[in-house]
Curated annotation (Swiss-Prot):
Belongs to the universal ribosomal protein uS4 family. One of its GO terms (biological process) is ribosomal small subunit biogenesis. This is Small ribosomal subunit protein uS4. GO terms for molecular function: rRNA binding; structural constituent of ribosome.
Amino acid sequence: MAKYLGPKLKLSRREGTDLFLKSGLRSIESKCKLEQPPGQHGIRKPRLSDYAIQLREKQKVRRLYGVLERQFKIYYKLAASLKGNTGANLLQLLESRLDNVVYRMGFGCTRSESRQLINHKSIMVNNKVVNIASYQVSPNDQISIRNKSKNQSRIKAALELVEQREKPIWLEVNSTKMEGIFKRFPERSDLSAEINEYLIVELYSK
């Protein structure tokens, strides 16, 4: 599957917000000017149309979760087919991706690193190895690190970092055993207010 291999900070500057693509707890605001677009002096921002604003929001969310365009559109169509609010459904689908759950539980410092752990068969779901990053986790599923992978330094480093981070209330994590439970899908109020999913719904509704 294709993936972005360029500078990660450049993506965050382009979207004007920290996409948490780099490991560590300190916001990258101290490393780069998020309100200034990429380039030595940045580019003067033109007044954006409604379409451009909607497109930018979609790109921001897509990059935040590390999902390609085609796959993101599939998620949207699935979200629209489900009962309830389409925008909230979309966020729940993205949040229940295995790579995101592994990241939220603190087994990987970033979503990208979490995908690597999955690809290298270091992650188990209900005691079975799963190596598909887009695997949809269901409520009460158990996520754990394989025994032979528990001594990896990057996993230990990630678990040390997560102790200083706010823990999602829809997850239950035992850092000592390197396992956790996906208790439920997150409510919209549980997630970042910086995401405006309504703009994405408006974009795809045209």
